[in-house]
Structures are given as structure tokens and as C-alpha cells.
Amino acid sequence: MNKVIRSHLFTAERAWGALDITNMNGISVRLHWTDKPYKWHINDGEEVFAVMDGAVEMRYKEDGQEKTVLLHTGDIFYAGIGTEHVAHPQGEARILVIEKEDSI
């Protein structure tokens, strides 16, 4: 089934609410809406994080040092296995997240 998703129109009822787009052989593709930070976490798989609308400050740890990068619409952040990170939206943001199904 084909889909067209206008990501800038998606709004969830709560921060980090998601629209499940598809699951491709155990890889989930979800569109998230948020206006609040997530929490520091480490995924048990790789994660691709694409800002579809808005701006997101991504904080992550590399070699024991906390680093920060400001992502704008169209920017992509890749978190490898074991990368501790947290996303802080700057106002409302819509983020496409691609990761292993049930990743934590």
C-alpha cells in the first residue's frame, strides 16, 4: 500500500507521540511529534533520526565527552549502537526515526 505523509501536518496528543509508517523486516519507521525533550538513553541498535520540521538540539556522548549539534529541517543524525543521546526540540518538531523494532 502506498502512502503520502505530509509530515508538517502531523501532531500527536502527547510529546513523542508517533505515527507508525511501516515496519521493514524488523526495522520500524515512525514519525514523531514533540515539543519536549526526550530522556538520555542508549539504543540497543542503530538509529537514524531525520528532522522533518523544526529544529532539534541533539546531545550525545562521544569518548566520554558530551557534545551538542543543532539539527534543522532536512538534517539527519545517526546514532551507532551504544551511543548515549537525548533530543531537545526547539519548540515543536517532527522527527522521522528509523530503528530496530522494539529498540530501547
How would you describe each model-predicted region?
Residues N25, M52-D53, H72-T73, G91:
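A cytosolic small-molecule/anion-sensing beta-strand core signal
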Residues I81-I104:
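Ligand-binding loop in jelly-roll beta-barrel domains
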Residues K36, G45-D63:
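Glycine- and acidic-residue-biased ligand/ion/polar-headgroup-sensing regions
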Residues K39-I42, E46-V51, T68-V69, A87:
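His/acidic/aromatic-lined binding-pocket segments of jelly-roll/cupin-type domains
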Residues D63-I81:
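Short acidic-glycine-tyrosine-enriched beta hairpin
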Residues I27-N43:
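Conserved short histidine dyad/triad with adjacent acidic residue
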Residues S28, V48, A55-E57, E84, ...:
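Structural motif
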Residues M1-L31:
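A short, N-terminal "cap"/entry segment at the start of jelly-roll beta-barrel domains
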